């Protein structure tokens, strides 16, 4: 019996031993860090020997640098979006432009030289190379005009760029350890780090911190392997911030747009001014883009300017892109040669008519490419204006999702004044509503203040309103629920202040304050049609002028002379001195 039990006991013992060994092995495997390393070429997504990864402010970019003849080149779109939006690439004429506070700097594709206004400089190797859909710019050239630093590393090739000079959480490594792809000892190793290596902490976890090494590797490291983090302010001692100067007035701007449609209408300026109070800037609508070569048409008058000057009123001629609908303004602005012609024409007009200022009113600008070209136009024009003591103001819509490409901050660097067109909240073809409700204008001012200094903002205000006509789409239906405007044909017509008031009187309608819009509102019915109007009057005007006063804006502008009730000027001079 004992002889039979012995083999069974041995087998059982062996099984137990194997189980114990397996358990110990599993425990060892569980708590033993993997030595597997990550392929850094794959990690940085490098597919060819002439590529280099780009790590910008501790984030891996989707863009890649190109190594050409041992020089580092980066895509124009990357430069514009991530490093310095003031670089402007004209893909039509293959020229790279950069505008400083005082100079226009240009470099032609494949050229070693660049011009700073009239001086030519040698860069030593090609500055920019055109590609099928963009351009490649030498990173050293970008650095020359940008608040950035960069270092290059090998195995694999990568460029680590710093462009944001904020506080970071920094630490040093306490003992040799590894940076891993993810937090956990089983995650592959990205890089071995040594005692006293410097690390930037991007995010702190319970046991693992997300970090960036000085050579651009971003991964995870055990928290206990790091010293206590401390705040470190990044600085770039080699970069000197530009100083922008502006031609600004030491008084409130009270600007009135004077719509002039013929040469003969200029002779009426004495009567026009005599019906106002407090105006110190007149902006006549004299000039417009007239062809695709950048030439202007004008109906200006030296006598008009002389009369305004005799009354102590400056003249800021308005230049627009609206009158000649056959002209492709986008074409003019996206070609450097035609844009330059336009700027020269504007300056020639300013000299010829002795204008004190230039007011740019280019509208219907859509898309980033057109928007970038428009801002470049403002930069280049500003230099010419300032060199000749001429004030530059630019009319812009209120900030909205459809015009995010407008870099109002950079526009304000160059232009002296940014004029918010605080009207057309509702417009021909839209649903019925206020032309300029007080909450909408308030939001527009607040949004603009995030990008533009208060003393450079002029708030544009309407002297006009729209009367809306709502007709049921079924002829025999009466007007009932007008909240759902899809059931109605909506039309509108522009009215001056007095003409709108006359419509109320004719239709026995009474206006009352509408709390939502902050304006006086009236409605009436004729047959099966409903008419609505949000009035422009002293009530709405005073609320906007109070916005100017409360926010210490540079002043106000009014569209347009002749549409106002005469009483508004007493309200205006209460706020604009």
Can you annotate each of these PLM segments?
Residues 2-205, 235-249:
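Primary recognition of N-terminal secretory signal peptides and signal-anchoring hydrophobic helices
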Residues 98, 196, 208-213, 221:
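SH3/SH3-like beta-barrel fold
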Residues 233-345:
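Glycan-recognition patch characteristic of GH18 chitinases/ENGases
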Residues 236-240, 465-544, 576:
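Glycan-binding loop/region signatures in secreted carbohydrate-active enzymes
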Residues 254-258, 279-284, 315-319, 358-360, ...:
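Hydrophobic faces of well-ordered beta-strands that scaffold small-molecule active sites
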Residues 261-276, 336-351, 400-408, 536-549:
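Short, acidic/polar
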Residues 286, 343-373, 417-431, 557:
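Active-site groove signature of glycoside hydrolases
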Residues 292-299, 344, 371-502:
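Substrate-binding surface in catalytic domains of secreted glycosidases
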């Amino acid at each position: 019996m004992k002889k039979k039990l012995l083999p069974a006991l041995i087998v059982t013992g062996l099984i137990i031993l194997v189980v114990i060994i397996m358990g110990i092995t599993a425990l060892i495997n569980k708590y033993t860090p993997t030595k597997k390393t990550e392929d850094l070429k794959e990690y940085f997504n490098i597919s060819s020997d002439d590529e280099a990864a780009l790590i910008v402010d501790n984030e891996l970019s989707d863009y890649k640098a190109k190594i050409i003849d041992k020089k580092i080149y980066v895509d124009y779109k990357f430069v514009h979006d991530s490093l310095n939006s003031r670089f402007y690439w004209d893909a039509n004429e293959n020229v790279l432009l950069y505008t400083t506070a005082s100079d226009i700097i240009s470099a032609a594709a494949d050229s070693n030289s660049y011009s700073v206004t009239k001086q030519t400089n040698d860069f030593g190797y090609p500055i920019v190379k055109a590609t099928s859909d963009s351009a490649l710019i030498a990173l050293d050239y970008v650095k020359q005009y940008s608040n950035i630093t960069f270092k290059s590393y090998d195995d694999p090739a990568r460029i680590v760029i710093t462009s944001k000079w904020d506080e970071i959480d920094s630490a040093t490594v306490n003992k040799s350890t590894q940076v891993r792809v993810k937090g956990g000892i089983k995650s592959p190793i990205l890089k071995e780090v040594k005692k006293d290596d410097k690390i930037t902490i991007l995010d702190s976890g319970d046991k693992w911190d997300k970090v960036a090494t000085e050579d651009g590797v971003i991964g995870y490291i055990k928290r206990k392997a790091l010293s206590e983090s401390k705040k470190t302010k990044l600085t770039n001692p080699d970069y000197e911030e530009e100083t922008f100067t502006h031609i600004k007035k030491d008084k409130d701007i009270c600007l009135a747009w004077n719509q002039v449609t013929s040469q003969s209408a200029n002779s009426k300026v004495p009567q026009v001014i005599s019906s106002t109070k407090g105006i110190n800037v007149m902006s006549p609508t004299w000039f417009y883009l007239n062809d695709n070569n950048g030439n202007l048409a004008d109906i200006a008058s030296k006598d008009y300017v002389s009369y305004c000057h005799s009354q102590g009123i400056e003249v800021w001629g308005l230049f627009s892109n609206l009158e000649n609908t056959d002209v492709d303004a986008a074409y003019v602005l996206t070609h450097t040669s035609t844009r330059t012609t336009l700027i020269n024409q504007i300056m020639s007009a300013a000299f010829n008519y002795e204008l004190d200022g230039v007011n740019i009113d280019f509208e219907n600008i859509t898309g980033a490419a057109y928007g970038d070209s428009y801002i470049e136009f403002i930069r280049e024009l500003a230099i010419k204006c300032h060199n000749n003591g001429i004030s530059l103001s630019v009319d812009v819509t209120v900030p909205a999702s459809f015009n995010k490409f407008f870099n109002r901050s950079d526009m304000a660097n160059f232009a002296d004044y940014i004029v918010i067109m605080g009207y057309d909240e509702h417009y021909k073809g839209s649903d019925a509503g206020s032309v300029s409700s007080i909450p909408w204008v308030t939001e527009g001012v607040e949004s603009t203040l995030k990008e533009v200094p208060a003393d450079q903002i002029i708030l544009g205000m309407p002297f006009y309103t729209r009367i809306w006509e709502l007709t049921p789409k079924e002829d025999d239906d009466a007007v009932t629920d007008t909240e759902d405007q899809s059931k109605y044909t909506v039309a509108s017509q522009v009215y001056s202040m007095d003409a709108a008031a006359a419509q109320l009187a004719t239709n026995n309608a009474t206006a009352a304050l509408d709390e939502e819009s902050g304006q006086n509102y009236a409605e009436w019915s004729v047959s099966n049609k409903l008419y609505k109007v949000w009035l422009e009057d002293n009530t709405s005007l005073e609320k906007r002028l109070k916005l100017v006063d409360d926010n210490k804006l540079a002043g106000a502008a009014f569209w347009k002379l002749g549409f106002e009730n005469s009483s508004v000027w007493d309200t205006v001079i209460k706020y604009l001195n």
